[in-house]
């Protein structure tokens, strides 16, 4: 697990460093990158391609956000989508209750994310399963 700053540049740098460590014989190899957001994933894809690593054939990449640009990069980015409209509606409801002087009721809300498969991931072959 590497810590980043959610930027495209940092996604590129961290992936570049990971590639360098792997090639220097760090005792590990990797075949997938899962980032905290889509911008870092886009940076990771760029670093992999710049180092001659095929995405998704050699290394698969998945982001988190499903921002609009994730569909436009090459290959299109696989990602985890968040229920943004539902999150916004729940937040607005909570804010309105607070403005009206009503105490928010403590509760846990679970909103399900979705897996969006695009071009940076691939289906495993029977041999790979």
Describe each PLM feature range.
Residues 83-129:
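Hinge/cleft segment of the Venus flytrap/periplasmic-binding protein
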Residues 6, 38, 45-79, 126:
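Venus flytrap/periplasmic-binding-protein-like
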């Amino acid at each position: 697990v590497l810590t980043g700053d959610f930027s495209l540049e940092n996604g590129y740098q961290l992936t570049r460093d990971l590639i360098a460590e792997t090639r220097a014989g760090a005792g590990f190899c990797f075949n997938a990158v899962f980032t905290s957001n889509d911008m870092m994933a886009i940076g990771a894809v760029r670093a992999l391609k710049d180092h001659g690593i095929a995405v998704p054939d050699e290394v698969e990449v998945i982001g988190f956000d499903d921002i609009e640009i994730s569909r436009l990069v090459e290959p299109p980015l696989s990602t985890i989508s968040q229920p943004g409209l539902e999150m916004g509606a729940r937040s607005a409801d909570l804010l309105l209750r607070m403005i009206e002087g009503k105490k928010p009721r403590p509760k846990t809300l679970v909103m399900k994310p979705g897996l969006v498969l695009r071009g940076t991931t691939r289906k495993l072959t029977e041999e790979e399963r």
